């Protein structure tokens, strides 16, 4: 069997190998010989030559099939050719099961559910371990010399030698990892008068190499226009001692109280000392970004925060900064709490209340979709209520960017109760999953419970995530008789298990928006132009005495002290700080307002 680093040919077999939380993608030329095949997998998984491994491939029905003999390997390749699949999906486990038929160490049924775990994907070629990176700086591909930036131009960077190429070019690399590249793989300033399109705008900015040498990550750099006299030029102006005029740090804020906490971050209410403005600060420890957790979702969240900053129904960004141990997002503080807290007080909402909230949510989702963003995490907890009673969506870490009309993605993600059937089936999906989640949320608002409530099941085996997914996929949704015909029909429209028939799911997203606006549940009840201008009076006005009022936040958070734990020097020493280059950001509109105070 030829090495996976050989020249690309149509007959090469793509091996997508999952091992210990990573996906290693490599290529081999048939015929595949069992001993060579196992040696190749051991090398890709960094196991020594005599280490016992168990190898299983996934057939077209999603079932794992062991490969222990040449005959079984040949059968896997034959099935791959018959099915015309693009790749052979393989799982590798260390050791052998104690008895035939028993699972291997680390093997359970969730391992084989498509996308059910977050896998860190690495492409192995010529000794390089390429990983997808958002290279927003103007960096030239080592192979084709074109710039690596923008939609359809995903960058790959070797995690060892930092060589950068387009995804489409990585199999043309002839330089072995560790050799000195002889190419233009450094950030390059554009020629005079020549710009690049960033986010649909002309960018005439220049790029610089890092003072420490090497290739700048560029993953976090902003998309704004840089022109003489622009707000961004002002943001980078300096005072007499050379410090940035608008530099933001933890010293600029007084931490007041914890207002939320999630798996990856906590959110603290804070006062901007100079202006006494109140903000929320989302704090993420850098140490969580290890081999099992990639930084891409933080990059995505920052990018979406920037896009959302001036839209009325989305939480916007004030600034970003970092310390050696943490990342900080300074965002709008929304004092009315979230819909989850509101629902806990009200139990269920009148239809006119649900109509108002869902109308504003529709506009927020359409705004994201029009910018190529799938939200993917709509739930009661992520819908905030401002001081006047309008909603704002927050938490963009689950978003998927760069989705155009007709584009699809396949990552398994979301909050279990809101995950759309197409995700559970392992199908590729688009904006449809957000409209399904809206249907679930509207059901919760008007019925006071989830359409898939499994709490209290007698059989403990039924009270599980897998059983919940089975219900979402198979069980017919029963609409409460207490709801009006209009409400019942719109819930049926959004909760259609077939995304092609689901309300709002048209190839042209504007056609989908019009279908929702013209539905009986909304038609004649909402002036959509006035709604988008926040000129429609909210049905509920939270009693907020001041911007420091925490009445609408759960005491399990607000009773917690906001202090940050002391830094651990040993932990900090293990953090690759270059991964966070360019994370800092200030919103020019916010900062110019503060200058005028």
From Swiss-Prot:
Entry binding sites for ATP: 259-267, 282
One example GO MF annotation: protein serine/threonine kinase activity
Assigned keywords, A-Z: ATP-binding, Cytoplasm, Cytoskeleton, Developmental protein, Differentiation, Fertilization, Gastrulation, Gonadal differentiation, Kinase, Magnesium, Metal-binding, Nucleotide-binding, Phosphoprotein, Serine/threonine-protein kinase, Transferase, Zinc, Zinc-finger
Classification via InterPro entries: AGC-kinase_C, C1-like_sf, DAG/PE-bd, Kinase-like_dom_sf, PB1-like, PB1_dom, PE/DAG-bd, PKC
Enzyme class, spelled out: transferase
Catalytic activity field: L-seryl-[protein] + ATP = O-phospho-L-seryl-[protein] + ADP + H(+); L-threonyl-[protein] + ATP = O-phospho-L-threonyl-[protein] + ADP + H(+)
GO cellular component: apical plasma membrane; cortical actin cytoskeleton; cytosol; plasma membrane
Residues at the active site: 377
EC number, as in UniProt: 2.7.11.13
Keyword Cell membrane: no
Region (Disordered): 181-238
Ranges of residues in domain AGC-kinase C-terminal: 524-595
Assembly and oligomerization: Interaction with par-3 required for the peripheral localization of par-6 and to form a par-3/par-6/pkc-3 complex, which is activated when cdc-42 interacts with par-6. Binds avidly to the phosphotyrosine interaction domain (PID) of a novel pkc-3 adapter protein num-1, which enables tethering and targeting of pkc-3 to the cell periphery.
UniProt record similarity statement: Belongs to the protein kinase superfamily. AGC Ser/Thr protein kinase family. PKC subfamily.
UniProt-recorded name of the protein: Protein kinase C-like 3
């Amino acid at each position: 069997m030829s090495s996976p680093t050989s020249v690309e040919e149509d007959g090469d077999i793509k091996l997508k190998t999952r091992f210990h939380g990573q996906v290693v993608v490599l290529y081999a030329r048939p015929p595949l010989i069992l001993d060579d095949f196992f040696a190749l997998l051991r090398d890709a998984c960094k196991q020594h030559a005599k280490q016992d491994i168990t190898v299983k491939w996934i057939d077209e029905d999603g079932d794992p099939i062991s490969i222990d003999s040449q005959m079984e390997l040949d059968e896997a390749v034959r099935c791959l050719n018959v099915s015309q699949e693009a790749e052979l999906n393989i799982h590798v486990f260390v050791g052998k099961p104690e008895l035939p038929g028993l699972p291997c160490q680390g093997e359970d049924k969730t391992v084989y559910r498509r996308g059910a775990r977050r896998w860190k994907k690495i492409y192995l070629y010529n000794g390089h371990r390429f990983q997808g990176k958002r290279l927003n700086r103007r960096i030239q591909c080592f192979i084709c010399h074109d710039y690596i930036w923008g939609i359809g131009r995903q960058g790959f960077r070797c995690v060892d030698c930092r060589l950068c190429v387009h995804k489409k070019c990585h199999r043309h690399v002839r330089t072995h990892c560790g050799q000195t590249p002889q190419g233009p793989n450094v950030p390059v300033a554009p020629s005079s008068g020549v710009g690049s399109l960033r986010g649909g705008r002309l960018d005439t900015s220049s790029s610089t190499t890092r003072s420490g040498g090497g290739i700048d990550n560029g993953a976090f750099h902003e998309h704004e226009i840089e022109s003489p006299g622009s707000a961004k030029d002002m943001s980078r102006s300096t005072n007499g001692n050379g410090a940035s005029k608008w530099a933001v740090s933890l010293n600029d804020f007084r931490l007041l109280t914890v207002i939320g906490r999630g798996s990856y971050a906590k959110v603290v209410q804070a006062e901007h000392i100079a202006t006494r403005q109140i903000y929320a600060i989302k704090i993420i420890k850098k140490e969580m970004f290890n081999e099992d957790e990639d930084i891409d979702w933080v990059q995505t969240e920052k990018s979406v925060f920037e896009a959302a900053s001036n839209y009325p129904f989305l939480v916007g960004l004030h600034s970003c900064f970092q310390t050696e141990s943490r990342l900080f997002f300074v965002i709008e503080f929304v004092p009315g709490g979230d819909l989850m807290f509101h629902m806990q007080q009200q139990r269920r909402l009148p239809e006119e209340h649900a109509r108002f909230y869902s109308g504003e949510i529709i506009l927020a989702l359409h705004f994201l979709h029009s910018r190529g963003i799938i939200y993917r995490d709509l739930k009661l907890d992520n819908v905030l209520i401002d001081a006047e009673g309008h909603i704002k969506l927050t938490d963009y870490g689950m978003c998927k960017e760069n989705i155009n009309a007709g584009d699809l993605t396949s990552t398994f993600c979301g909050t279990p109760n809101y995950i759309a059937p197409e995700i559970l089936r392992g199908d590729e999906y688009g904006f449809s999953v957000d409209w399904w989640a809206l249907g679930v949320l509207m059901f919760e608002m008007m019925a006071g419970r989830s359409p898939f409530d499994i709490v209290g099941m007698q059989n403990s085996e039924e009270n599980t995530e897998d059983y919940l997914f089975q219900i979402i996929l198979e069980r017919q949704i029963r609409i409460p008789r207490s709801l009006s015909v209009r409400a019942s029909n719109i819930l049926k429209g959004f909760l259609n298990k077939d995304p092609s028939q689901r309300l709002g799911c048209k190839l042209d997203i504007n056609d989908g928006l019009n279908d929702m606006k013209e539905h009986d549940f909304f038609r004649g009840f909402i002036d959509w132009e006035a709604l988008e201008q926040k000129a429609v009076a909210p049905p509920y006005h939270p009693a907020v005495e001041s911007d420091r009022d925490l009445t609408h936040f759960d005491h399990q958070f607000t009773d917690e002290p906001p202090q940050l734990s002391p830094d651990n020097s040993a932990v900090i020493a293990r953090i690759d700080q270059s991964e966070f280059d360019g994370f800092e950001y200030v919103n020019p509109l916010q900062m110019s307002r503060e200058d005028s105070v």
